[in-house]
Amino acid sequence: MQVTVEKKEGIHCSLLIEVPANEIDSVVSKEINRTAKTIKMDGFRPGKVPAGMVKKKYGEQIRMEVISDLIPQKYSKAIQDEKLAVAGIEVELKENKEGQPLKFVANLELFPEFEVTGFEKIEVQKPVVELTDKEVKQMIENLRKQFATFSEVDKAVEKDDKVTIDFVGKKDGEAFEGGTANDTDVIIGSGQMIPGFEDGIIGMKKGEQKTITVTFPQDYQNKDLAGAETTFDITVKKIQQAELPEVNDEFVKKFGVKGGVDTFENEIKENMQRELKFILQRKVKDQVFKGLREIAEFETPKSLIKREIDAAKQNLLKQMGGAKGFDVNQLPDNLFEANAKQKVETSLILDSIMNSQEFKAEEAEVESLLDELVQAYEEPEKTKEQIKKNDKEMANLKALVIENKLTDWVLEQAKVTEKTEDFFEVIKENMQAQQAGF
């Protein structure tokens, strides 16, 4: 086999690979003879079909099957011999004739080689959130609202009321698609409608009609409506007032708590603290990763981005429960491209840093992180044992420990400032970020 490096520019490289004719023809001949012993053909007994007949009828097909098997073997050896770190490959067949060498080009995308410097340029705003009894009481109040019962009342609409409405949305005086609905239930203050919509209903009474003006958010998913000033003609058809359950032993049992109200309140606070810790870690880590992407200079392999896009599509399908009749491949790649590119770039940068630094995950550190994570489950010890039996899960935990160490290492060199934030705003932002990332 002869290998010629045709061009190598950046992360792109082409290998012209030539396989001797006798090597190809020998394998093809053996496959034809093997096929002749098993194939059925009119006029011949099984195993007695002449090889020449098989070659005449199936020779081209057999040759292509042989080549399809042989090409990956040849380019894999060439890549190994040339010591190339390949991210993606496309094969272009050049010459394929009996009695002549097989020639093909392997167009490669290589993993970029780069060094990350300038960590002091990274700016991180570290969120500081104080979790007090006020936030705990508000969380319990939110839980009470989840179990609220509603009864119809004859009064003006107030916050937390459930209203049944008809509405027609208009832009520039014309009704827009998706802006009209009848008999829609809205809980005032829940944030299920765009900002300003629910506030505009407060004070209305049953049977009343009103036109309100609201502006769609700049980041609204429908670009035709993003940032647009619109009007909504609203008719209130029913008003229901919420009746919240008392926080007593019966109520806390709904959440699997057996120790009464005091235990319930303590568990709520512990859960809030645990969730807050991981969210704040994520917020800081996201800023660190963003900063790393800004200072690192390299070309991102498109094949890795495409692979990540395909994985995101499959993940979306899983989230939809494998919806029948829904082909995720029909979704445009650009819907997933930005997130996919970020993930690939972050992964490449972290790998580059880890190759130059020695970050290790000690067994005790992995165990400590596992203990912390399983506290969010109903049966922590049982969950812990299940995870420890799963090699993939344990490998992910080990990787997370190393990732946390790397993040701390970068933070020691970065410009870090603090910013006080509200607990519920942090939770809301986290939910929005998760939704935006599918």
From Swiss-Prot:
Compartments in which it is found: Cytoplasm
Keyword Protease annotated: no
Q: Which SUPFAM superfamilies match?
A: FKBP-like, Triger factor/SurA peptide-binding domain-like, Trigger factor ribosome-binding domain
* Entry annotated with the keyword Cell cycle: yes
Pfam families (UniProt xref): FKBP_C, Trigger_C, Trigger_N
- Which reaction equation describes what this protein catalyses? [protein]-peptidylproline (omega=180) = [protein]-peptidylproline (omega=0)
The UniProt entry, under Gene3D superfamilies, shows:
3.10.50.40, Trigger factor ribosome-binding domain, Trigger factor, C-terminal domain
Q: Which domain of life is it from?
A: Bacteria
A GO-annotated cellular component: cytoplasm
Q: What does the UniProt entry state concerning the protein's domains?
A: Consists of 3 domains; the N-terminus binds the ribosome, the middle domain has PPIase activity, while the C-terminus has intrinsic chaperone activity on its own.
* Family the entry assigns: Belongs to the FKBP-type PPIase family. Tig subfamily.
Q: What is this protein called?
A: Trigger factor
* Gene transcribed to yield this protein: tig
